[in-house]
A protein has these predicted regions:
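Repeated loop/turn-to-beta-strand initiation elements of outer-membrane beta-barrel proteins
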Residues: 80-83, 130-132, 188-190
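Sec/Tat signal peptide C-region and signal peptidase I cleavage site
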Residues: 17-21
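Residues on the lipid-exposed face of transmembrane beta-strands in outer-membrane beta-barrel proteins
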Residues: 30, 71-75, 85, 120-124, ...
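Extracellular/periplasm-exposed beta-strand and loop segments of Gram-negative cell-envelope proteins
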Residues: 36-67, 88-117, 143-171, 199-226
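Transmembrane beta-strand segments of Gram-negative outer membrane beta-barrel proteins
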Residues: 22-36
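Short, structured loop/turn "capping" segments at alpha-beta junctions
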Residues: 129-134, 149
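Positively charged n-region of N-terminal signal peptides that target proteins for export
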Residues: 1-5
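Bacterial N-terminal signal peptides
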Residues: 7-15
Length: 235
């Protein structure tokens, strides 16, 4: 009788147990994602060399952070191996000219750009049949510059003031990823995820000193950290 009661209790608990990953599963996640550029820029050096000596050599381009909604879809080839496609909406970033570190001169805004950064990664899940499932991943990122025109509006640049600047090309590069799924009941899960994306592009100026031809004024590495928190559903 006692064994029967225990069996009935276990059977009653089974439907409430957490759902874990299996081969052939699809997972859809909705996350809040912060994109934090880790940029590297030599704007001042390029402008002074290629256009005119009107900037400090330490001047550089800076992009601000942005938080956006992000949808991703994963497919499990095995219970450990999954492919994830990140479908973030366009991310808008203000672009400014910054002086040398420690300068009292404030950053001077040039405008904003919109970037669309879909990313495809292959993941290894360490504990797919447990509540806490950490994973790592690697893949490729494609960043498409949707709104890429800026204006050099500083009076200190003389004849270059008012000149148009453009982000010249889209970017394709590697991506690394680490994260954690917390498996809940009925296929639901919580997710925390960190990515590092290699994004590089050229920046050009419509040069009034050279017949308004486009002149390269920077080789910009954006290289953002992408940090996400959200929920997901397994199907």
């Amino acid at each position: 009788m006692k064994k029967t009661a225990i069996s009935l209790m276990l059977a009653a608990l089974l439907p409430a147990m957490n759902a874990y990953a299996e081969q052939g599963d699809w997972v859809v996640r909705l996350r809040a994602t912060n994109i934090s550029p880790n940029e590297s820029s030599d704007l001042g050096k390029y402008v002074n060399k290629n256009v005119a000596n009107v900037m400090s050599n330490g001047a550089e381009l800076k992009l601000d952070n942005n938080t956006i909604p992000e949808l991703d879809i994963s497919y499990y080839w095995t219970k450990n191996i999954a492919t994830e496609l990140i479908l973030a909406l366009g991310s808008k970033h203000d672009v400014s000219v910054a002086k040398e570190p420690g300068s009292v001169v404030p950053n001077q805004k040039l405008g904003s750009i919109d970037a669309l950064p879909p990313t495809l990664t292959v993941q290894w899940h360490f504990n797919p049949d447990q509540t806490f499932d950490p994973y790592v991943g690697a893949g490729i990122n494609a960043t498409f510059m949707l709104d890429r025109t800026l204006t050099l509006n500083q009076s200190s640049v003389g004849a270059l003031q008012g000149s148009k600047i453009k982000i010249d090309r889209d970017s394709f590069g590697p991506a690394l990823q680490a994260g954690l799924d917390v498996n809940l009941k009925d296929g639901w899960l919580l997710n925390a995820d960190v990515k590092y994306l290699w994004i590089d592009t050229d920046v050009k100026l419509r040069n009034p000193l050279a017949g308004n031809s486009w002149t390269k004024i920077d080789s910009l590495d954006v290289n953002p950290w992408v940090i996400s928190l959200g929920i997901g559903k397994r199907f």
